[in-house]
């Protein structure tokens, strides 16, 4: 390997910075899409869970109040169990929690990439900077393996939210990055 010089160090530092920006952007979009998936799964959980619970309560009430309401109570109970069966099969609450955990993991990766780029990179030795980049990349790759792929709707909503400044910090609007 050639001896490092200031030109080579500068080029490598710029390449590491560019890659950190890519990781940050990737984590930004992936995290926002997972937050959108969290919202969708929460909605599905409520849309299936509330009717199942309400109909079960109604069928129990109808069955207890009147002997002539047994058929109606049975039909309502069957509909409630149908909602419950779909809810159990879809497992919306687990998927909601999984999407939220993935979103937060992506936020951690985004923050680590940004802090490394903005705070640490100017002061790290090139080999140390490369090692930190590799560690953040590994974290992102591991998260990509476990995160559920987002659907088209989550992708579009995430892109719209980011485009409208939904992931912008106020401090970034009033200051400029340190020399970059």
What is each model feature region?
Residues 47-91:
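Short hydrophobic alpha-helical transmembrane segments
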Residues 2-51, 65, 86-180:
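Conserved non-transmembrane functional hotspots
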């Amino acid at each position: 390997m050639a001896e490092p010089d200031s030109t080579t160090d500068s080029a490598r530092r710029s390449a590491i910075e560019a890659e950190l920006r890519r990781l940050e952007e990737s984590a930004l979009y992936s995290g926002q899409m997972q937050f959108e998936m969290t919202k969708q799964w929460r909605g599905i959980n409520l849309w299936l869970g509330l009717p199942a619970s309400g109909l079960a309560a109604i069928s129990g009430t109808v069955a207890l109040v009147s002997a002539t309401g047994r058929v109606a109570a049975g039909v309502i109970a069957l509909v409630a169990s149908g909602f419950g069966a779909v809810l159990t099969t879809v497992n919306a609450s687990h998927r909601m929690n999984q999407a939220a955990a993935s979103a937060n993991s992506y936020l951690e990766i985004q923050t680590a990439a940004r802090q490394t780029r903005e705070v640490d990179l100017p002061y790290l030795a090139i080999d140390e900077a490369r090692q930190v980049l590799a560690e953040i990349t590994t974290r992102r790759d591991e998260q990509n393996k476990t995160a559920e792929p987002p659907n088209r709707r989550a992708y579009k909503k995430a892109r719209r939210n980011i485009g409208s400044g939904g992931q912008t910090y106020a401090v970034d609007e009033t200051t400029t990055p340190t020399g970059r």
